[in-house]
């Protein structure tokens, strides 16, 4: 189906509607699964030697020192323009402001007299950040991951990226306070972070995007008792735009293409009650495509994308909630009026002047978002992902005495005698003290 084809939602059967919202299939092939499993086992067993061998094999780079030196980091910064450094600093300031505001106050309540319950927050002690390499290094992801890690107070922050690591990534890491950076990429980097090696320290939780091998490696280590936790399930990038008759077609087209150029498996969807706007957006997409260096990639993504005409904006919102996009852009008049009705989205962008690029780089929100429908149960990355919560309770004698019979009754009903005895023994001790 061509992206220029307008689809009337209400003319489609329920089966056709479900098909329109079906994402491009992602599944690790058996060969990827086996290859990744072998890499994990090899790195766990052979450590640094395996990491160097994989760098030579996959990255075509001979790596002697896995850890990047302070001198190399300083030299990388010296090669960057002041303009880029200032832009990074401005982005970090906004990211820091937004994520610092997410700090939760401690919970400290008396549930009944003499029964004090608290919830306290602690940082995840050690985190690993994976940053993909390639022709377009995602240094902005360093800012998005390392900044909340620093605010959360994570003691050890370790970054891995395929060699040779781009200057932008090294400088961004230094800017955000990352001290340990390693020339390791791919599934082998995930293995090193999960299990540790002679050079790379083992971490408690791994963050960051990657290709199919990295994604599969993260999945596998998260399911191993000796592995590590991960940030969230990963999938192709996606955007859904809701537009009304007042939307600017060129703006809508640019937002759709900003996702389509990510990869051939990306998906973009336009929902609008105005068929004329849909046609104008399709024309604007074609015009802008002609000027994009990554036009071929974007065209492949558009083949699985949709222009859907609806009855009204309320139906647009209902369809969007059913789809649960990673990015939701609302280019309508009074866009904020629709926010309360949105139930599933990774990040929402309101109005003509809130392009998705703002959230990707510098508005302050995090660009690491749930995709592939995981917005139904997962949240956008935030400070809480670098923290853990624990509860504390303290009962006074009076508080314990008042609650004792309740605990004994419940424990007896569950036939957990030792639980009941732990209370009964104390009740008897209090009676003896009286």
From Swiss-Prot:
Enzyme class: oxidoreductase
Sites where the protein binds NAD(+): 130, 188, 211
Pfam families: Histidinol_dh (PF00815)
Pathway entry: Amino-acid biosynthesis; L-histidine biosynthesis; L-histidine from 5-phospho-alpha-D-ribose 1-diphosphate: step 9/9
InterPro entries assigned: Ald_DH/histidinol_DH, Histidinol_DH_CS, Histidinol_DH_monofunct, Hstdl_DH
UniProt: substrate binding residues: 237, 259, 262, 327, 360, 414, 419
SUPFAM superfamilies cross-referenced by the UniProt entry: ALDH-like
Cofactor requirement: Zn(2+)
Gene Ontology MF term list: histidinol dehydrogenase activity; NAD binding; zinc ion binding
EC number, UniProt record: 1.1.1.23
Keyword presence, Zinc: yes
Positions of disulphide bridges: none
Cofactor note: Binds 1 zinc ion per subunit.
Reaction(s) this enzyme catalyzes, per UniProt: L-histidinol + 2 NAD(+) + H2O = L-histidine + 2 NADH + 3 H(+)
Gene3D superfamilies in the cross-refs: 1.20.5.1300, Nitrogenase molybdenum iron protein domain
GO biological process, one term: L-histidine biosynthetic process
Subunit architecture: Homodimer.
Family: Belongs to the histidinol dehydrogenase family.
Entry protein name: Histidinol dehydrogenase
The species this protein was found in: Salmonella choleraesuis (strain SC-B67)
Gene it is expressed from: hisD
């Amino acid at each position: 189906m061509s992206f220029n084809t307008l689809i009337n939602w209400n003319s489609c059967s329920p089966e056709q509607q479900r098909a329109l919202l079906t994402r491009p299939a992602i599944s690790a092939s058996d060969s990827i699964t086996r290859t990744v499993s072998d890499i994990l086992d090899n790195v766990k067993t052979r450590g640094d030697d395996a990491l160097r061998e994989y760098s030579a094999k996959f990255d075509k780079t001979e790596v002697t020192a896995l850890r990047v030196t302070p001198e190399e980091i300083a030299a990388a910064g010296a090669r960057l323009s002041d303009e880029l450094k200032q832009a990074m600093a401005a982005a970090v300031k906004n990211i820091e402001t937004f994520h610092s505001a997410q700090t939760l106050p401690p919970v400290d309540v008396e549930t009944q007299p003499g029964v004090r319950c608290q919830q306290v927050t602690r940082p995840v002690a050690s985190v690993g950040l994976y940053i993909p390499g390639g022709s377009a290094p995602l240094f902005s992801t360093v800012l998005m991951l390392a900044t909340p890690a620093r605010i959360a107070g994570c003691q050890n922050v370790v970054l891995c990226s395929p060699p040779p690591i781009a200057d932008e990534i090294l400088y961004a890491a230094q800017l955000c306070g990352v001290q340990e950076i390693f020339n390791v990429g791919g599934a082998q980097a995930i293995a090193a972070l999960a299990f540790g090696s002679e050079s790379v320290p083992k971490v408690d939780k791994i963050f960051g995007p990657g290709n199919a091998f990295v994604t599969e490696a993260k999945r596998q280590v998260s399911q191993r008792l000796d592995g590590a936790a991960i940030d969230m399930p990963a999938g192709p990038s996606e955007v859904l735009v809701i537009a009304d008759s007042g939307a600017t077609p060129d703006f809508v087209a640019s937002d759709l293409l900003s996702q389509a150029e990510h990869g051939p498996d990306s998906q973009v969807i336009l929902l609008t009650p105005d068929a004329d706007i849909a046609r104008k957006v399709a024309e604007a997409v074609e015009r802008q495509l002609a000027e994009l260096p990554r036009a071929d990639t974007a065209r492949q993504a558009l083949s699985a994308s949709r222009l859907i005409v609806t009855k009204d904006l309320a139906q647009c919102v209902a369809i969007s909630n059913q789809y649960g996009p990673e990015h939701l852009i609302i280019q309508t008049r009074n866009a904020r009026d629709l926010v309360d009705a949105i139930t599933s989205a990774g990040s929402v962008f309101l109005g003509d002047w809130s392009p998705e690029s703002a959230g990707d780089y510098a508005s302050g929100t995090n660009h690491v978002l749930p995709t592939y429908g995981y917005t139904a149960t997962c949240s956008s990355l935030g400070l809480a992902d670098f923290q853990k919560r624990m509860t504390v309770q303290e009962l006074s004698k009076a508080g314990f005495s008042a609650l004792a019979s309740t605990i004994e009754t419940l424990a007896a009903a569950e036939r957990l005698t030792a639980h009941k005895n732990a209370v009964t023994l104390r009740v008897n001790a209090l009676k003896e003290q009286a």
